[in-house]
């Protein structure tokens, strides 16, 4: 399907080189993310860092809400550290922080790429690894997809680029 139309799209040359560049498992929690007009980070989802202790900070540009805790599986197998005594070490990158997040708001700008016009990314949003550990849930993606659809319709109706659609208009339609 990529021949002739999008030859730059394909499997990465440097990943899974021993398996014809195909992942061993279908389940992938995170993938590539855009660099957007805004970036969702840990302080945006954490109820204590900038929130009020019950929820993340308010964001006037929000178009979706998430509520799941920070949950990351290890990004690397066990290290070879001398601790614990078994010598196995800890799995690098494992985070299970369900008590630090409450409801948090996701701004429209995380779906709007800086480098391209005419496209929104409701799944591969502009976020840090830690923020994506909670955004990755299907209800959040559904809410972001709905917001993206509303933004696209407003962009067409108003004759403006997606980055210029007023967030208040998206919020009103949602």
Where are these regions (language model features)?
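Flavin (FAD/FMN)-binding glycine-rich loop and adjacent Rossmann-like elements that form
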Residues: 1-174
């Amino acid at each position: 399907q990529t021949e002739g139309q999008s030859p730059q799209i394909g499997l990465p040359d440097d990943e899974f080189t021993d398996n014809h560049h195909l992942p061993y498992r279908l389940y992938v929690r995170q993938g590539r993310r855009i660099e957007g007009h805004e970036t969702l980070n840990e302080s945006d989802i954490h109820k204590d860092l900038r929130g009020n202790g019950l929820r993340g900070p308010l964001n006037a540009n929000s178009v979706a809400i998430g509520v799941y805790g920070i949950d990351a599986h290890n990004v690397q197998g066990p290290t070879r550290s001398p601790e614990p005594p078994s010598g196995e070490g800890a799995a690098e990158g494992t985070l299970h922080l369900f008590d630090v997040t409450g409801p948090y708001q996701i701004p429209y700008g995380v779906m709007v790429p800086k480098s391209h016009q005419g496209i929104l990314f409701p799944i591969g949003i502009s976020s840090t690894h830690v923020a994506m550990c909670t955004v990755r849930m299907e209800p959040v993606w559904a809410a972001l997809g709905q917001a993206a659809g509303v933004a696209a319709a407003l962009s067409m109706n108003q004759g403006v680029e997606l980055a210029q659609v007023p967030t208040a208009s998206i919020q009103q339609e949602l």
